[in-house]
A protein has these predicted regions:
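Intrinsic disorder/low-complexity segments
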Residues: 16-18
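N-terminal, polar/charged subdomain of small-to-medium soluble alpha/beta proteins
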Residues: 20-146
Length: 146
């Protein structure tokens, strides 16, 4: 029949293994990591670029399929440890001036590696602004259609 069905028109939905799931990050199935600490050479100011700085990263990764919820099979989901490893590798290997650019780069890498429909990331950089505990950026990246 027609896709999407009339009852779902205007909603962000897609088919995954015969199950209709939402692709809206607020409601779709995802895995997440909170407080992943990585080291990265990042910053605009010269004093920030002499040594790697600690960053705290929260990331949510949209699942390309809901199969794992029924199968209990590790192969049907996204591996938390693999996501953490990818973030650590990219944070160490790349040099960015802006947290915004780093957020985009990490999201793109995660979407590409894990076929995720979307990634939401927050990167926190402590102790940069006097009087503020930390600064940071949050970013939502959707995989290109197609």
């Amino acid at each position: 029949g027609a896709w999407p069905p009339p009852a779902l028109e205007g909603m962000h939905v897609h088919r995954a293994g015969g199950v209709i799931i939402s692709s809206m990050p607020e409601t779709s199935p995802h895995i997440f990591l909170q407080g992943l600490v990585v080291e990265s050479l990042i910053g605009v100011y010269p004093q920030e670029r002499h040594a790697p700085q600690p960053l705290s990263i929260d990331v949510a990764v949209g699942l390309p399929s809901t199969a794992a919820f029924l199968s209990d099979n590790f192969q049907d989901t996204v591996d938390y440890a693999a996501v953490a490893d990818l973030i650590r590798q990219e944070a160490a290997a790349q040099r960015f001036q802006l947290l915004e650019r780093m957020a985009h780069h990490l999201c793109q890498a995660i979407v590409t590696r894990f076929q995720a429909p979307w990634v939401r990331i927050s990167i926190v950089k402590p102790g940069i602004v006097p009087g503020a505990q930390a600064v940071g950026v949050s970013y939502l990246f959707r995989a290109p259609a197609g």
